[in-house]
């Protein structure tokens, strides 16, 4: 999908940008994936029980969970990222989230950090898949775009020095859209918080079959996390 340019970025040999179909570009934030980032502690503190780190990349969060004594498995589709994570001591598999995943139906927490709610370009479909992976009372922890950001489903690619990857589907979900996305996926209550300029949601993994669970997205619902 993103292949060689992504691997070069992880190895420090390139600084690719994400290009959108309208021609706009922004830097690929690879530095934050290679080391602890502000706000990581907040989402790690909410991981309970066996945790699946989806799109684990070079494995910083998978390693951090293991160091806390939390059983954690990372999955990623990029061989070099998997190798990096394993070299740091993480338990990681080369696996697509939509393929067969060990422990299906038994994970207590599923982690979609660093914008990985965008995987596949269809956030509701991704959350439906996550619900299959979770235990009945499990939860998904998801990183979001700030409030006011649109819900976008589009094609993007990586570009650097005249080279470009193939286009691939991706999505961006603003904090004030995640309740609707979770509802479309048939999931439960959404709790949103912010810390260190990052936005997150905890989403109940149990399927809702009748009444919609609403979270009022008013300014006082966006509360800074402590610690």
What residues fall within each predicted segment?
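Conserved beta-strand signature within the Rossmann-like core of class I S-adenosyl-L-methionine
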Residues: 137-145
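S-adenosyl-L-methionine
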Residues: 1-46
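A short SAM/SAH-binding and catalytic strip from SAM-dependent methyltransferases
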Residues: 107-123
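Conserved SAM-binding strand-loop segment of SAM-dependent methyltransferases
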Residues: 89-99
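Short alpha-helix
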Residues: 168-186
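A short glycine-rich, Lys/Arg-flanked "PGG" loop and its adjoining helix->strand segment in the class I
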Residues: 124-136
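A short acidic, Gly/Pro-enriched loop at the edge of an enzyme's catalytic core
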Residues: 98-109
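Conserved SAM/SAH-binding beta-strand->alpha-helix loop
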Residues: 78
């Amino acid at each position: 999908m993103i292949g060689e340019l992504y691997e070069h970025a992880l190895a420090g040999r390139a600084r690719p940008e994400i290009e959108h179909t309208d021609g706009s570009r922004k830097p690929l934030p690879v530095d934050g994936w290679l080391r602890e980032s502000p706000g990581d502690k907040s989402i790690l503190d909410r991981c309970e029980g066996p945790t699946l780190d989806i799109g684990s990349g070079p494995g910083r969060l998978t390693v951090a969970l293991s160091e806390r004594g939390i059983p954690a498995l990372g999955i990623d589709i990029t061989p070099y990222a998997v190798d990096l994570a394993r070299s740091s001591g993480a338990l990681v598999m080369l696996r697509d989230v939509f393929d067969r995943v060990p422990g299906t139906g038994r994970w207590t927490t599923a982690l979609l950090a660093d914008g990985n709610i965008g995987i596949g370009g269809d956030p509701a479909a991704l959350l439906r898949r996550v619900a299959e992976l979770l235990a009945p009372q499990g939860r998904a922890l998801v990183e979001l775009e700030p409030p006011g950001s649109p819900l976008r489903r589009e094609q993007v690619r990586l570009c650097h020095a005249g080279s470009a990857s193939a286009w691939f589907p991706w999505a961006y979900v603003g904090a004030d859209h995640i309740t609707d996305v979770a509802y479309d996926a048939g999931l439960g209550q959404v709790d949103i918080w912010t810390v260190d300029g990052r936005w997150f949601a905890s989403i109940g993994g149990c399927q809702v079959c009748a009444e919609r669970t609403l979270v009022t997205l008013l300014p006082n619902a966006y509360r800074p996390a402590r610690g």
